[in-house]
Regions:
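Intrinsic-disorder/low-complexity coil detector
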Residues: 8-10, 67
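Hydrophobic N-terminal alpha-helices or hydrophobic patches in metabolic proteins across all domains
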Residues: 22-140
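Short, low-complexity, charge-dense intrinsically disordered segments
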Residues: 1-4
């Protein structure tokens, strides 16, 4: 694997007697490999809640992370869930887009129900509550 083609680095970490497999994303979204993948999102900021540190940011969509996929910021990969209009605790769906931040180390995945699609404009309208603070590009 090289940095230009991207890929996933698989690691095994040992926690006590337990072995945990962790995938670390390395420039993978640059080549669009994740778009179309089915993922499970654990929702830690349900629709209708506020950001834990920035109380003026209201979550108009469900937002969470994909377990065991580590993003470049060292945290699990963040994801917006579109098309679900009620708060949920977790969600299994398809990655339909990647939001690339030019002024941050993070990329956000956009996940939706199988067979549902959104235009770049529709995605930005739904995630602008948070993405308005960054220089971003949506990749479909």
């Amino acid at each position: 694997m090289d940095a230009e083609s991207g890929g996933v680095l698989y690691l095994q970490s040992f926690f006590g007697s337990e072995v945990m497999d962790i995938r670390i994303l390395i420039n993978l979204t640059e080549v669009g490999v994740m778009i179309g993948s089915i993922v499970r999102v654990v929702v830690d900021r349900p629709l209708g809640t506020f950001h834990p540190k920035h109380k003026d940011i209201y979550y108009s969509v469900n937002y969470g992370y994909v377990s065991n996929v580590m993003a470049p910021d060292g945290e699990e990969q963040d994801a917006y869930i579109l098309g679900i209009n009620k708060p949920v605790e977790e969600f299994v769906g398809r990655v339909i887009a990647i939001i690339h931040r030019f002024d941050d180390v993070e990329e956000k995945w956009v996940v939706a129900t199988e067979g549902v699609s959104f235009t770049k404009e529709e995605i930005m309208k739904q995630v602008a509550f948070q993405e308005q603070y960054f220089h971003t590009e949506i990749r479909l």
